[in-house]
């Protein structure tokens, strides 16, 4: 092994090898571009890819803040009265949540155009993150729809979510993470689906973005309709899932041995 390392060092320290470095970099660059062109099929393939990237960039903006309701539309949704106006209990297990994520998450729920919601927060944060509890308690004192409980110990994402469920009083249950944010019209659209389609399980598309700018999207996840084979292979539903409390009657809640994939297990 030492002999091989010695020979490698001799090659790297050779003046000719060092002098040819720029030429090798250029050659490798040309090879990589050639491979990329080959993978795209042709020059037309490259053009198509460039066009797709341009479309994707525009779509990211379109599905960002540009999709938020205008003042007029917000007022219209807030005044809407459905035949069924169920309370939606949103479960959020907390653990050492960064302050910026916490404020954005709670703020997005409070900014919903549909107002009959309940935010259930079970906090397993350690003493070094006491600000989580302080902030949540302050908001809960101002808004009775926010229900907060400090846990004696962190029970993991499944255990903490189960504690959230114990706090819930809504007819529908929503699964949410402490680093998520909701589109302002999300609950309105869900309740609309409940009324128009008698839905008891609802999910939506989602996007990953670079906080704090919602428009700086990294990926967009457009989900299919219910596809059992796909769902058996991967949890394409994920968040934001909302389902009728009746669907949980007689079933086991989240199991800690499936932490990380507890939503899929459920």
Q: For each predicted feature, which ranges?
A:
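Conserved donor NDP-sugar-binding/catalytic core segment of glycosyltransferases
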Residues: 185-217
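Glycine-rich, basic loop-to-helix element that forms the pyrophosphate-binding segment
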Residues: 151-168
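Acidic donor-binding segment of Leloir-type glycosyltransferases
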Residues: 108-153
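Acidic donor-binding loop at a coil-to-helix junction in glycosyltransferase catalytic cores
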Residues: 259-266
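A recurrent flexible, glycine/aromatic-enriched loop bordering the glycosyltransferase active site
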Residues: 158, 166, 216-242
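Short, well-formed alpha-helical segments that are part of the catalytic scaffolds
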Residues: 97-111
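Boundary detector for helix-to-coil junctions that initiate low-complexity/charged tails
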Residues: 1-72, 79-84
């Amino acid at each position: 092994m030492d002999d091989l390392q010695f020979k490698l060092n001799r090659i790297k320290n050779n003046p000719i090898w060092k002098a040819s470095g720029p030429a090798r970099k250029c050659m490798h660059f040309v090879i990589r571009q050639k491979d990329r062109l080959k993978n795209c099929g042709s020059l037309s393939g490259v053009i198509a890819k460039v066009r797709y990237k341009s479309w994707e960039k525009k779509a990211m903006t379109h599905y960002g803040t540009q999709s938020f309701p205008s003042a007029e539309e917000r007022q219209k949704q807030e005044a809407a009265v459905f035949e069924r106006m169920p309370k939606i209990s949103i479960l959020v297990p907390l653990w050492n949540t960064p302050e910026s994520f916490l404020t954005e998450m709670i703020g997005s729920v409070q900014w919903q155009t549909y107002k009959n919601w309940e935010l259930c927060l079970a906090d397993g944060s350690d003493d070094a993150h006491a600000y989580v509890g302080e902030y949540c308690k302050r908001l809960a004192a101002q808004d009775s729809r926010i229900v907060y409980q400090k846990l004696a110990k962190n029970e993991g994402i499944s255990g903490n979510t189960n504690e959230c469920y114990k706090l819930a009083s809504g007819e529908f249950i929503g699964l949410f993470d402490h680093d998520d944010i909701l589109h302002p019209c999300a609950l309105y659209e869900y309740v609309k689906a409940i009324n128009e389609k008698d839905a008891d399980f609802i999910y939506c598309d989602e996007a990953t973005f670079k906080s704090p700018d919602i428009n700086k999207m990294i990926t967009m996840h457009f989900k299919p309709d219910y596809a059992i084979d796909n769902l058996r292979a991967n949890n394409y539903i994920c968040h934001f899932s909302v389902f009728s409390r009746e669907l949980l009657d007689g079933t086991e809640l989240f199991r800690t041995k499936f932490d990380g994939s507890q939503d899929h297990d459920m």
